[in-house]
Amino acid sequence: MTLLVHASLRSTGLQAEPLRDALLEVLGEDGTLVVPAFTADNSDTSPSYRARVRGMTPEQSAAFRAEMPAFDAATTPSQGMGRLAESVRTAEGAVRSAHPQTSFAALGRRAAEFLAVHPLTSHLGEDSPLGALYRARAQVLMINVDFDVCTAFHLAEYKTRAPARTYRCVVQRPGGGKEWTEYEDIELDDSDFGAIGAAFAWGMEQKGQLGGRPARFFSIKEAVDHAERWMTEKRC
């Protein structure tokens, strides 16, 4: 089995490393554990950047931009993905995809296979690790989080041909130093993921508890196909 996990361990009493190891044990030698390892702090086109420079003078924002950390797949921590994601990313033998904004980290037999290809122009599309997980019919486990963070739904945005926009971020050069790179991809929009998830939850997920908090388990293919139908019908 291949398992994509989103987890917030806050208020669960669960510890990241023991949970990671328990999941790997359940998956077995042939299984693969995947987590998002996203990074927003190296981009000047992200909502988090706009929030941080709001109220700054042009000089202050330019100085802030110049000091932004460059993405390095080997060392840059994930941001806002939680302790479990970091415990996977930093584990011995972990693999990380190369995208400077929406990388994934994985452990297990097919980790390198799933994360080998991740072009700039496909944050979470068919050519990304998410697309590979969809084709492999992976499962999703969400612990103590809601559908508004369900990464799988983003793949449906590519299938419904969402409009494009420009992205820009700073990355580490192989020989040292840093450089800014600009590229086009679809405009990712998670504002209606809660509603998409509420409609999906009727009969398409298994519910339980981990650490006394809600847990959901479902097929990534069923989630993406549902989101594609929902977006086709309801997004303008």
Residues covered by each model-derived region:
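N-terminal and secondary-structure boundary signal
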Residues: 1-236
